[in-house]
């Protein structure tokens, strides 16, 4: 995996044929051209036996997207033991199973549509908890790191460079990019990174894939 993505632990895979398709169009001068566009598909996320949400996604890293979404919605806790993750590509469903029994029927009734180009959804009282989040005052962020990161990230082969119309988020350590995720919604890309980070702690079994 490290070799495939160069300096990244995980990164974009623009040559994956399932993520883009070729279309015929016209450029700004009216000339007929063939170009690539990103494919968008639904993914339904279950937590144990309960259907939580269907999100629109580019389709890579569905297991990390599901785990990260549930974590960022406060449906998964940091100390939860994830027993298994099952992904069925035929029906575009991910099932995350935990040792703890869960029931979010009441929380799912309270839905907030967030603003932005890709209107997202948050459940329950999540918006009220944002005020409690703070960054440690000892955190250091250097502008030289940002310039270096910008150069590295912008030159990385990606779906954005191949097809455009997609968002990207990158997990970094100082001036080194580690995990680069892309998706049709920036919140999806962030959820994938969160899912990756949680998987380092709590997921011992690999995702079971069908289809």
Where are these regions (language model features)?
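Intrinsically disordered, low-complexity regions enriched in acidic/Ser/Thr/Pro/Gln residues
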Residues: 2-174, 179-180
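Short, flexible, glycine/charge-rich loop motifs used to bind or transfer phosphoryl groups or to couple energy/partner
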Residues: 159, 198-199
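A short alpha-helix capping/helix-coil boundary motif
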Residues: 172, 199-200
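Positively charged, proline/Ser/Thr-rich regional signature most characteristic
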Residues: 177, 182-189
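Alpha-helix N-cap/helix-start and coil->helix boundary motif
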Residues: 62, 186-187, 210
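Single conserved hydrophobic/aromatic residue that forms the stacking wall/gate
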Residues: 201-211
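A short, polar/charged loop-to-alpha-helix boundary motif
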Residues: 187-198
């Amino acid at each position: 995996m490290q070799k495939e993505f160069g300096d990244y632990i995980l990164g974009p895979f623009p040559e994956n044929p399932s993520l883009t398709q070729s279309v015929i169009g016209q450029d700004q001068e009216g000339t007929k051209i063939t170009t690539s566009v990103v494919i968008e598909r639904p993914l339904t996320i279950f937590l144990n036996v309960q259907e939580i949400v269907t999100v629109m996604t580019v389709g890579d890293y569905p297991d990390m997207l599901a785990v990260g979404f549930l974590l960022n919605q406060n449906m998964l806790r940091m100390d939860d033991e994830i027993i298994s993750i099952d992904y069925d590509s035929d029906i575009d469903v991910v099932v995350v199973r935990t040792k703890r029994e869960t029931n979010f029927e009441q929380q799912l009734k309270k839905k907030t549509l967030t603003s932005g180009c890709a209107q997202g959804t948050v459940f329950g009282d999540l918006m009220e908890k944002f005020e409690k989040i703070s960054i440690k005052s000892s955190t250091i962020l250097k502008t030289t790191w940002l310039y270096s990161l910008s150069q590295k990230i912008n030159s990385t082969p990606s779906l954005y460079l191949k097809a455009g119309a997609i968002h990207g988020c990158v997990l970094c350590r100082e001036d080194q990019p580690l995990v680069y995720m892309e998706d049709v919604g920036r919140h999806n890309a962030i959820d994938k990174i969160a899912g990756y980070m949680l998987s380092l702690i709590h997921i011992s079994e690999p995702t079971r894939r069908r289809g």
